[in-house]
């Protein structure tokens, strides 16, 4: 006997009252006290017809079938793949409204999770919203039914690769060549052995790193070289872990970007972490240094420093700066970049900041101010170990409002700091990702 549907999939009309933290519309079709329904593709204030797609204990999920009354902030998505590809979720919302929404998510998270409110809300930072992604990873899959290779981000259903020919958020040197890249992979003998391609862009060079599960034939290597020559793209191969990455073409290449306001150049490797949005990154650094307010006579501790994205600009403006990072490769590059830029007042240490560091040499040094830029999980482990009373000011750059709110709760409600200011930064336009910056002062 055929399996019965577990819930009623009949379409119905509803009004959208809010936007969720992941970019979906929020409806309460059963009234104020009823279960919430998250609606993909809907915006606040809209009246829509929706089709249920999933039912959960505490909430339901649906998708828009028809918009009966559109929001004045609704715009036509630039990408024809919007709604299928998971790379963007907010292209149907005007760009200024996206930023307002992210600012709201940030403030709501601080209040709801951290039980804190800032004295001042900083104007949100934004930069170029198209062609900004200078680092990313495309999935690759040969699809027998289509008879061709798909290259792109995953669909919202992560089992599938989005069938795209162009991506408007990726740097044009890569985003406009996805179809050509797919054609190249179609021609390879080992087309089924390439699961992903990573891209990264410096100021002068764009690089692709081709991950392959089996050794590539000489013909395949030559095809990749010809593609690199034709389009001016450096080609790297990766047969295993990060340590297996090798340059295929050209014979030598220098991946680098310069932060002109501080006359600092960063040299990096193809799989290194760099901030995805170069234009916003420069604004963010200037904003963070201005908020930190550290001068030539002061010592600054920079945690989760990576390549030294904040550390090296800080070294131009303060007496001494110490950067701490868990990735030994990034620390090696940070030290080398400090030497290349003649910054002898920047020192770097390798440390896993999720573990006990109370006996680490840098932990015993004295500092005036603290800057930190942790991963999504936040910084609670290291914050609980630091002698926080030595810091006059803390500037916290966050990539997740939930972990920032948790850490703000600790700093304000347990350690007695004051949350002076906070603001969103639109590092990832057209996505629901919320980057932010917060300023804490010692009482």
UniProtKB/Swiss-Prot annotation:
The keyword Cell membrane does not apply. It is an enzyme of class 2 (transferase). GO terms for molecular function: 4 iron, 4 sulfur cluster binding; iron ion binding; RNA binding; rRNA (uridine-C5-)-methyltransferase activity. S-adenosyl-L-methionine binds at residues 275, 304, 309, 325, 352, 373. Its EC number is 2.1.1.190. The keyword 4Fe-4S applies. Belongs to the class I-like SAM-binding methyltransferase superfamily. RNA M5U methyltransferase family. RlmD subfamily. Catalyzes the formation of 5-methyl-uridine at position 1939 (m5U1939) in 23S rRNA. HAMAP family: 23SrRNA_methyltr_RlmD. This is 23S rRNA (uracil(1939)-C(5))-methyltransferase RlmD.
């Amino acid at each position: 006997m055929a399996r019965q549907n577990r819930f009623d999939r009949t379409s119905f009309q509803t009004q959208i009252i809010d936007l969720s933290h992941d970019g979906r519309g929020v409806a309460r079709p059963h009234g104020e006290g009823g279960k919430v329904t998250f609606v993909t593709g809907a915006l606040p204030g809209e009246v829509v017809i929706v089709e249920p797609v999933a039912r959960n204990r505490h909430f339901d999920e649906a998708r828009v079938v028809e918009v009966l009354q559109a929001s004045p902030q609704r715009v036509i998505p630039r990408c024809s793949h919007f709604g299928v590809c998971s790379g963007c979720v907010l292209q149907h919302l005007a760009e200024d409204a996206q930023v307002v929404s992210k600012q709201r998510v940030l403030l709501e998270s601080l209040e709801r999770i951290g039980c804190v409110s800032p004295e001042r809300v900083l104007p949100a930072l934004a930069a170029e919203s198209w062609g900004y992604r200078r680092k990313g990873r495309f999935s690759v899959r040969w699809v027998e039914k289509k008879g061709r290779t798909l290259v792109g981000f995953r669909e919202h259903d992560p089992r599938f690769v989005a069938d795209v020919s162009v991506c408007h958020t990726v740097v044009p040197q890569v985003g406009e060549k996805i179809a050509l890249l797919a054609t190249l992979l179609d021609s390879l003998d080992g087309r089924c052995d390439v699961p992903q391609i990573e891209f990264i862009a410096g100021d002068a060079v764009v690089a692709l790193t081709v991950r392959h599960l089996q050794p590539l034939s000489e013909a395949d290597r030559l095809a990749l070289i010809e593609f690199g020559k034709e389009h001016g793209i450096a080609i790297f191969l990766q047969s295993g872990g990060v340590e297996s990455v090798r340059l295929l073409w050209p014979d030598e290449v220098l991946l680098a970007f310069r932060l002109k306001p501080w006359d600092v150049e960063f040299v990096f490797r193809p799989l290194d972490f760099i901030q995805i949005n170069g234009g916003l990154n420069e604004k963010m650094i200037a904003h963070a240094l201005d908020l930190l307010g550290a001068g030539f006579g002061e010592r600054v501790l920079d945690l989760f420093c990576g390549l030294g994205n904040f550390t090296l600009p800080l070294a131009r403006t303060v007496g001494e700066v110490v950067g701490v990072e868990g990735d030994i490769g990034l620390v090696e590059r940070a030290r080398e970049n400090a030497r290349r830029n003649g910054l002898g007042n920047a020192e770097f240490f390798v440390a896993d900041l999720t573990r006990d560091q109370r006996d680490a040499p840098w932990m015993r040094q004295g500092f005036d101010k603290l800057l930190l830029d942790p991963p999504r999980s936040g910084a609670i482990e290291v914050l609980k170990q630091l002698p926080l009373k030595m810091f006059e000011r803390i500037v916290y750059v966050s990539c997740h409002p939930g972990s920032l709110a948790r850490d703000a709760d600790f700093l304000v409600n347990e350690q007695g700091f004051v949350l002076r200011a906070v603001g969103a930064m639109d590092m990832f336009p057209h996505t629901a990702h919320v980057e932010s910056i917060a300023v804490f002062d010692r009482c």
